[in-house]
Amino acid sequence: MSQQTTPAPGVTKVTFKVTLTSDPKLPFRVFSVPEEAPFTAVLKFAAEEFKVPAQTSAIITNDGVGINPQQTAGNVFLKHGSELRLIPRDRVGGSSLAR
């Protein structure tokens, strides 16, 4: 079970609601992270919460726009808002090579 820690004074946090799109029940998690946290850490944390591999996952907006993880969580929040979707990359486009 994870522990909640009290943020240092002056640390601004942003809150995201991340939905797992590969599950028909569309489960979601809500969590807050420091504004300056790298978004790659947010992606990794969200993937771990849903027990999917972070290396083969991506986060997109509700409109289907991909998010570049090489920015801060605060930047993503300002550009795309708080509602995001986690999608395992094996579910994105592509074609099967098996015949």
UniProtKB/Swiss-Prot annotation:
One of its GO terms (biological process) is protein K69-linked ufmylation. Residues 94-99 form a propeptide. It comes from the Eukaryota. There is a cross-link at residue 93 (Glycyl lysine isopeptide (Gly-Lys) (interchain with K-? in acceptor proteins)). Keywords: Isopeptide bond, Ubl conjugation pathway. GO terms for cellular component: cytoplasm; nucleus. SUPFAM superfamilies: Ubiquitin-like. Pfam families: Ufm1. CDD domains: Ubl_UFM1. The keyword Coiled coil does not apply. InterPro entries: Ubiquitin-like_domsf, UFM1. The keyword Hydrolase does not apply. Ubiquitin-like modifier protein which binds to a number of as yet unidentified target proteins. Belongs to the UFM1 family. This is Ubiquitin-fold modifier 1. The gene is PR46a.
